[in-house]
Each structure stands twice: as C-alpha cells, then as structure tokens.
C-alpha cells in the first residue's frame, strides 16, 4: 500500500484512519462545491460568500476537496507514470484531474462550463470505497494475526518413533 503515497511503516489501521480522514475532508469541501455548482441550483440559488465570482469560489473550495484528499492517488499515479505502468491510481488521477483541469481552464482562461462538482464528488466516492477496503483489510490482518497468536510456539513431532520438539 506504500505505492498509494502512505508512509512506510504505517499499519493497516493507520492507513484506514488516514483514508477516513481524507474522505471526511473531501466530503466537507464537496458539499459546498455541489451546492454552488450549476447542478446544485436545484436545491436553491445560493449567493457566493463575499460576492465572489461563482467559478472562482468553486475553484477555491474544489481545490480543498481534491488536493489533500487526493494526494495519495496523485503520488501513486506519478509513480505509475514514471514506471510506465497503469493502475487504479492512474484512472483516479485521470478522471478527477481531467474534470478539475478542464474546470480550471474554464475558470481562468476560456469560457465554458465547469465540472468541479463532478471531480469533487467522484473523489468522495472513490475515497469512501478505498476507506471501506482499508478497513476490511485491517480487520482481516487483525484476524490473521489473532489466529497466528493461537499457534503454540513449540510443537512435538514424532520422527522415526521418537518425539522431537520443533
């Protein structure tokens, strides 16, 4: 799992907790991104704080929803690209990154629709799935460790009619 940008030596439980925290941060930022996006207008047309341009506000909040929470995927995606392989992180970086970079262009360089909410909400669902996977792996690791602890340190084996401890 260290290829996902986690620090070497992190336990599975620590990695699961890290993914939970990243999921919660992404969710916290993705809610306003969704509500202020064109798609969120079905829930009401909210005025942006401080009279900010809507796309600029979405850029700022979406950056919070994507930068820190998605960092392990960006690190793993970079490593995969450097090694000329494709993996799950490559898919995540391409999908989230494409929506974010296109929206960044539409915010600052050309006229167009922004898709910050798509990139943010997609990352929220990816992080939720990754967190649940890490929790399951941590639980399985703990169960295997508990089973290994049940095994006695020494065993008696009969070889050539003699009892030998191994």
Language-model-detected regions and their locations in the chain:
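Intrinsic disorder/low-complexity detector
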Residues: 4-5, 55, 89, 162
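General structural signal for secondary-structure boundaries
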Residues: 1, 50, 165-166
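Intrinsic structural disorder/low-complexity segments
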Residues: 5, 9, 41-42, 133, ...
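Histidine-centered metal-binding segments
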Residues: 1-15
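Cytosolic catalytic regions of P-type ion-transporting ATPases
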Residues: 156-166
């Amino acid at each position: 799992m260290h290829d996902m940008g986690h620090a070497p030596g992190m336990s599975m439980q620590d990695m699961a907790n890290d993914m939970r925290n990243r999921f919660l941060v992404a969710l916290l930022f993705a809610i306003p991104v969704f509500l202020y996006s064109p798609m969120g207008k079905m829930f009401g047309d909210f005025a942006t704080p401080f009279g900010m341009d809507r796309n600029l506000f979405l850029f700022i909040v979406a950056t919070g929803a994507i930068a820190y929470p998605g960092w392990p995927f960006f690190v793993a995606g970079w490593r995969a690209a450097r090694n000329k392989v494709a993996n799950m992180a490559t898919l995540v970086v391409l999908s989230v990154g494409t929506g974010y970079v296109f929206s960044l262009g539409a915010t600052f360089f050309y006229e167009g629709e922004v898709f910050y909410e798509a990139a943010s909400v997609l990352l929220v669902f990816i992080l939720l799935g990754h967190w649940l996977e890490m929790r399951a792996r941590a639980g399985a690791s703990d169960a295997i460790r508990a089973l290994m602890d049940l095994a006695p340190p020494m065993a008696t084996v009969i070889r050539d009619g003699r009892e030998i401890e191994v």
